[in-house]
């Protein structure tokens, strides 16, 4: 199974590829990086993930890239890790919330649903890249 994550300072959005369908999963709320890396490690083990797709911004965001790379090194995972450009994934995910009212949009941001929709976009990009190369 393939899992994607959108690593943020407060939340980690999660999406999975199940039988060819990309689905958002419940986001991991970050209290600190050790707790978040343990939670992600547990999820990867529970779901028997073989490939972890991680969103990274454009290389001009050096601090953010270093933070994401450091966090991923804390994750206990022996499978394949693939980094995919995440530029505009959060904006595209937010556009998917257009049907919600203001209050529900704010809640979707706070509870991590937006982050998991962003992880869906990252996973879509990975799938497009893999299909293009085959």
UniProtKB/Swiss-Prot annotation:
It is found in: Cytoplasm. Its EC number is 3.1.-.-. Belongs to the YqgF nuclease family. This is Putative pre-16S rRNA nuclease. CDD domains: YqgF. InterPro entries: RNaseH-like_sf, YqgF, YqgF/RNaseH-like_dom, YqgF/RNaseH-like_dom_sf. It is an enzyme of class 3 (hydrolase). It comes from the Bacteria. Could be a nuclease involved in processing of the 5'-end of pre-16S rRNA. The lineage of its organism: Bacteria, Pseudomonadati, Campylobacterota, Epsilonproteobacteria, Campylobacterales. Disulfide bonds: none annotated. PANTHER family: POLYNUCLEOTIDYL TRANSFERASE, RIBONUCLEASE H-LIKE SUPERFAMILY PROTEIN (PTHR33317:SF4). One of its GO terms (cellular component) is cytoplasm. Keywords: Cytoplasm, Hydrolase, Nuclease, Ribosome biogenesis. GO terms for molecular function: nuclease activity. GO terms for biological process: rRNA 5'-end processing. SMART domains: YqgFc. It comes from Helicobacter pylori (strain ATCC 700392 / 26695). It holds the Pfam family RuvX.
């Amino acid at each position: 199974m393939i899992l994607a994550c959108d690593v943020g300072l407060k939340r980690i959005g999660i999406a999975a590829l199940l039988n060819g369908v990309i689905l958002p999963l419940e986001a991991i709320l970050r209290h600190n990086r050790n707790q978040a890396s343990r939670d992600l490690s547990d999820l990867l083990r529970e779901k028997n993930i073989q490939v972890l797709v991680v969103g990274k911004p454009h290389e001009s965001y050096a601090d953010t890239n270093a933070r994401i790379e450091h966090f991923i090194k804390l994750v206990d995972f022996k499978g394949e890790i693939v980094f995919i450009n995440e530029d505009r994934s959060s904006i595209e995910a937010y556009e998917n919330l257009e049907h919600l009212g203001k209050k529900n949009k704010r809640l979707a941001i706070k509870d991590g649903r937006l982050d998991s929709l962003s992880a869906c976009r990252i996973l879509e990009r990975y799938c497009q890249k893999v299909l293009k190369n085959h």
